[in-house]
Amino acid sequence: LVGTATKYSECLLAVKFRQVDEDGHVVGGPFNYIEHGMGPKWKWLAKIFAFFGIGVGLLGIGTFTQVNGISSAVNNFFDSNNAWTVSLFGRTYSWTVVISCLILTFCVALVLIGGIQRISKVAQVIVPFMAATYFLAGILIILFNITDVPAAILTIVQSAFGLKAAAGGALGAMVVAMQKGIARGIFSNEAGLGSAPIAAAAARTNEPVRQGLVSMTATFIDTIIICSITGIAIVLTGAYDMGLEGVAVTTKAFQLGLPFPDGVASFILMLCLVFFAFTTILGWDYYSERCLEYLTNGKKKCIKAYRWIYILCVFIGPYMTVSAVWTIADIFNGLMAIPNLIALVALNGVVAKETKDYLDRIKKKEID
């Protein structure tokens, strides 16, 4: 509920305070509503947001976590036992990781540098079908284990609030569990992070409230539906308690819970993750480029150089450990969210006024 309300507020503000740049493009986001909503004296806070927005794109959920997830999913399908390995940077990797890294980096470069948008458009068309496939797979696992669902939900609740911890450390366990939950929630739906408003600002609407309502539904679908199904499926199959991490946990849940051979389940998850992560990588390039444009006043040379750096980070991602990837992502997510959350608190009166005016106009039948 907090995430949904946060997404509503930030996307409403993004549309209200958006601007038109020199090229005639509509741009906006937290940096705009911080500067124009809170006032010019807060421009320093807008710049801090933009700076860390670039950091999240380059080193966080824009590249490292996505590429690491793709390479892990591909490796789980083609070489789960790491039979074909190569030594790089003092560590041993499966050849599938290296090959998938090269292919992904090449595809991202084609879109960002080569301007070949057909790849991204194909991915965007396929993603809804992949989302439906992922959703149905999760539902199947739940249906096949329907009698165990209440126990699984109880386990999730107990784990979420640290209720299984010893009495002496229960409070500390609860704090840690909630911290992890909030961090993963931000990664999942990006509510409060400040990325969604950058996309919402470009929406073709003159009603800030309407865009806020549309944007907040994404948080509900992603967190309440998709993530809940995934979590329940993982607990039902026992995959959460097998010493696995990252994509391997969900892969094992699909293998154990679906009535298909392990290879089929791994293939389904691999395809879903590849398309989800690829479109996310491209999306975060857009977000972080808007942040860079704000900091550099739209200098084209800076944008072109940035794209090469972004591609380099895509190439590096698969060779990092899962723990390192998530630690970096959590740090930058927090640093990016803080300026945005400060702005949301400061501008809550604007959100309330816009919402009231919109509802009054509906009552008067001035709008549909």
Residue map of PLM features:
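Extracellular/periplasmic helix-exit of transmembrane alpha-helices
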Residues: 8-18, 22, 139-155, 163-169, ...
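Transmembrane-helix boundary/entry motifs in multi-pass membrane transporters
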Residues: 1, 11-58, 250-269, 293-302
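Membrane-interface alpha-helices at helix entry/exit sites of multi-pass transporters
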Residues: 26-27, 36, 40-48, 82-91, ...
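Transmembrane helix-loop junctions in multi-pass membrane proteins
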Residues: 57-70, 81-83, 108-120, 140-152, ...
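Selective recognition of specific alpha-helical transmembrane segments in multi-pass small-molecule
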Residues: 2-10, 101-116, 127-147, 183-184, ...
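Transmembrane alpha-helical segments of multi-pass small-molecule transport proteins
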Residues: 46-51, 78-114, 132-133, 266-271, ...
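Membrane-interface loop-to-helix entry segments
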Residues: 49, 67-74, 95-157, 292, ...
